[in-house]
């Protein structure tokens, strides 16, 4: 079902499947995300532009891959629901972000998601770059208060 939807609504994927028509080969090479705008269009809004474009960190001197997101709201709902299916409500968790190399660059989907979880999570949630004692204190506080 997903394969058929992508084939119908994603022009790049559609052309790829014309060359490789088997659903067993239903993915695009990572290089395509560097050279093409890979977007699955909403059939009701075929000319919708992305609300967000994330980029990979890439390696020094390389062209980063791009991840075009048409709906910020749908993207947030997707990762939040996936988290909550596995772990329960986001609000009950304290999220501690220790992501130095990611914080120093823009366009990271991981930072975007962690930042959103921090905003939804317990009050002591946050990014703690090189604040090891603060992190240790928060973990100790959370353990004694049974905050995951």
Where are these regions (language model features)?
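Conserved adenylate-forming
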Residues: 102-148
């Amino acid at each position: 079902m997903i394969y058929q939807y992508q084939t119908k609504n994603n022009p790049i994927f559609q052309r790829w499947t014309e060359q490789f028509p088997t659903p067993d080969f239903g993915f695009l090479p990572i290089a395509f995300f560097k050279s093409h705008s890979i977007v699955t269009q909403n059939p009701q809004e075929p000319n919708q532009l992305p609300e967000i474009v994330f980029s990979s960190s890439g390696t020094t001197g390389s062209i980063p891959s791009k991840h075009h997101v048409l709906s910020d709201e749908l993207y947030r709902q997707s990762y939040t629901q996936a988290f909550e299916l596995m772990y329960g409500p986001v609000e009950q968790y304290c999220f501690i972000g220790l992501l130095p190399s990611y914080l120093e660059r823009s366009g990271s989907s991981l930072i975007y998601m962690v930042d959103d979880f921090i905003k939804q999570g317990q009050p002591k949630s946050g990014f703690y770059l090189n604040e090891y004692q603060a992190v240790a204190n928060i973990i100790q506080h959370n353990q004694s208060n049974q905050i995951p």
